[in-house]
Regions:
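Glycine-rich phosphate-binding loops of nucleotide-dependent enzymes
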Residues: 2-255
């Protein structure tokens, strides 16, 4: 498609007298990583919740692939092609890596989750297709040797990778990542950053990333948008953001 994959205009959200978002305007282009940064309480997660449908703004529009989705429910947005990970893990710890990734395909299953288990022909065919796609995601994330391991037995970094695999199973046209590096060690962060870049480069999936690790943000972002008190105060390439006096005063000076 031509033009932005995602376009946000005049987006405002308030909880009583607290203005979480104030006239936010943002566009995400195809195969682009846009990072949202700012102090705690700046509105980053609120914006992600508006994009994924968990919050409904009082004003403004969210347009995804040319379609106004501002009033669309979260599950409808997922079906439309918006995948998301959360700050907390959304994995099923008693299930295997393979089963977790397969569970991510539920929005795409025309025959329903249990059709394959009931041995309906359409369900069996669909199950085979998604099993093949799940294997491809497992290999992409370098989890082949762990495909049959219970997720609860894995390290935190590997569980984060499985969580990302579940989001990829939605077959998204846009991926929203909420603080994916939180709680990870240096090696785990490096691995996950590499996979995020591969998602952009090999799969051509644009990504909106909320992240506090400035080294990761500056290394992998195409653009950085800076928020403060619900407002977008700066936007540009990482090198521009590093040298922006207002950003340094509001956020980077704290690092």
């Amino acid at each position: 498609m031509t033009g932005p994959v995602l376009e946000v205009t005049s987006l405002s959200l308030a909880f009583g007298l607290v203005h979480a978002l104030d006239q936010i305007a943002l566009a995400v282009q195809p195969a682009e990583i846009v990072s949202l940064i700012g102090p705690n309480g700046a509105g980053k997660s609120s914006l992600l919740n508006c994009l994924s449908g968990f919050y409904r703004p009082q004003q403004g529009r969210v347009v995804f692939r040319g379609r106004d989705i501002t009033r669309l429910a979260p599950h409808r947005r997922a079906k439309a092609g918006i995948g998301r990970t959360f700050q907390g893990l959304q994995t099923y710890d008693s299930m295997t890596v393979r089963e977790n990734v397969l569970s991510g395909f539920h929005t795409s299953m025309r025959g329903g989750l249990f059709a394959g288990f009931l041995y309906w022909p359409s369900g069996q065919r669909e199950e085979a297709v998604f099993a093949e796609k799940a294997e491809e995601i497992i290999e992409f994330l370098e989890l082949e040797e762990l495909r049959h391991a219970p997720v609860g037995s894995l390290s935190y970094g590997l569980r984060k990778r499985v969580d990302l695999g579940r989001a990829l199973a939605l077959q998204p046209a846009l991926l929203l990542l909420d603080e994916p590096m939180a709680g990870m060690n240096l090696e785990e962060k490096g691995d996950l950053a590499r996979f995020i870049l591969d998602i952009r480069d090999a799969r051509q999936i644009p990504i909106v990333l909320v992240e506090h690790d400035m080294e990761v943000v500056m290394d992998i972002s195409d653009r950085v948008a800076v928020m403060e008190w619900g407002r977008l105060i700066a936007e540009g390439a990482p090198a521009q953001i590093r040298q922006n006096p207002r950003v340094i005063a509001a956020y980077l000076g704290q690092e």
